[in-house]
Amino acid sequence: MNEQTQYLTNSLVEQLALMAMKDYGLTMVDALALVYHSQWYEKVTDTETGLYFQSPAYNYRLLRHEVAFGKVN
């Protein structure tokens, strides 16, 4: 993963954690744990998926689906 890709991924993690805090009433630590321990995170760090280049809203929908159903759609 190059520096630009890492920056985009880190930005997504931050934004998704903030969204999860708001929607699920989580602390920052719990929200980050949710994101970092998700199947979504495995996929976003795989540059071949291109998820790092998608919008935070799109990625958050994937994370919410995983929380609700146990897997990324």
Tell where the protein language model's regions lie, with residue ranges.
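C-terminal alpha-helical interaction appendages
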Residues: M1-N73
